[in-house]
Curated annotation (Swiss-Prot):
Cofactor(s) in the UniProt record: Zn(2+)
Similarity comment text for this entry: Belongs to the peptidase M48B family.
Pfam families registered for this protein in UniProt: Peptidase_M48
Organism from which the protein derives: Xanthomonas oryzae pv. oryzae (strain KACC10331 / KXO85)
Gene that specifies this protein: htpX
Keyword Secreted: no
Membrane topology qualifier: Multi-pass membrane protein
Example of a GO biological process term: proteolysis
Primary localisation category: membrane
Protein name: Protease HtpX
EC number: 3.4.24.-
Residues that span the membrane, as ranges: 5-25, 34-54, 155-175, 193-213
One of the record's GO cellular component terms: plasma membrane
InterPro entries, A to Z: HtpX_protease, Pept_M48_protease_HtpX, Peptidase_M48
Compartments reported by the entry: Cell inner membrane
Upper classification of the organism: Bacteria, Pseudomonadati, Pseudomonadota, Gammaproteobacteria, Lysobacterales
């Protein structure tokens, strides 16, 4: 985890330093630029890491997920035993296991630490999937935890947030100066309007980048689920999802880590956290045994 954080921070600092050089060439005040970079990094990463640290608490509260401490039914006992076995195979600590009330077939994983995560399944999943299919879904979620996807997404979002804040203000300043014709006249009301609009535009592109990365993660988590539960079980689980694909009612903060995402075509597809189920199934069918 810490190696990943260090690498992302190092990359972010290097690119921001390059941006600082470019902005200096464009005539942006270096002192103002340094302050802007620091402010952007604090706000950009701060929000992402606060969300990450609170992710388990917020997920439980928003979904009403009930953590299984002492199994009361054979199903709950099976859930705990399956997650424990898969967590050991993946080399991570035993996550909390929870069930939340939801009609859709879905599950999610969250948590700031791969050794202190949460895996939750919907009541709809338990009602409509057999144990082989449910085992594959649990393997998919354990793979998310083992791959450190929650931390990686938080780091990526922090980098993107930082760049949105910086670029919106730098480009806004350049446009404002060009329109007013006076760099020293101070920022007018128009500058803040321009920055607001640019943050919306750049934020949209940042979301597209984050969702592209999220879709890549899903293929990897499917492969991990296939390794833990078996490729045929993982394919069967995704086929079941394709037959019973309903509205995703998961809260936005955990949707990216569910087994199933939304559907859409054209431009809307660029903002989806999950690839189409047909593509995920095809990728599993095309994978050879050693890749799984």
């Amino acid at each position: 985890m810490f190696n990943r954080i260090f690498l992302f921070l190092l990359t972010n600092v290097a690119v921001l330093m390059l941006a600082g050089v470019v902005m200096s060439v464009l005539g942006v005040n270096p002192a103002q630029m340094s302050g802007l970079l620091v402010m952007a990094a604090i706000f950009g990463f701060g929000g992402s890491f606060i969300s990450l640290l609170l992710s388990k608490f917020m997920a439980k509260r928003s979904t009403g997920a009930q953590v299984i401490t002492e199994p009361r039914t054979p199903t709950e006992r099976w859930l705990l035993e399956t997650v424990r076995r898969q967590a050991q195979a993946a080399g991570i600590g035993m996550p909390e296991v929870a069930v939340y009330d939801g009609p859709e077939i879905n599950a999610f994983a969250t948590g700031a630490n791969r050794n202190n995560a949460l895996v939750a399944v919907s009541t709809g999943l338990l009602q409509h999937m057999d144990q082989d299919e449910a085992e594959a879904v649990l393997g998919h979620e354990i793979a998310h935890v083992a791959n450190g996807d929650m931390v990686t997404m938080a780091l990526l979002q922090g980098v993107l947030n930082t760049f949105v804040i910086v670029l919106a203000r730098v480009v806004g300043g350049i446009i404002d100066s060009a329109v007013s014709g006076n760099r020293d006249s101070g920022r007018g009301f128009a500058y803040y309007i321009i920055v607001f609009v640019l943050e919306m535009v750049f934020g949209m592109f940042a979301t597209m980048i984050a969702m592209w990365f999220s879709r890549r993660r899903e293929f990897r988590a499917d492969a991990g689920g296939a390794q833990l539960a078996g490729r045929s079980k993982m394919i069967a689980a995704l086929e079941r999802l394709s037959l019973n694909h309903g509205q995703n009612t998961l809260p936005s903060q955990v949707q990216a880590f569910g087994i199933s995402g939304g559907v859409g075509d054209g431009l809307r597809r660029l903002f989806l956290s999950h690839p189409p189920l047909t593509e995920r199934i095809a990728a599993l069918r095309a994978a050879n045994g050693t890749a799984m």
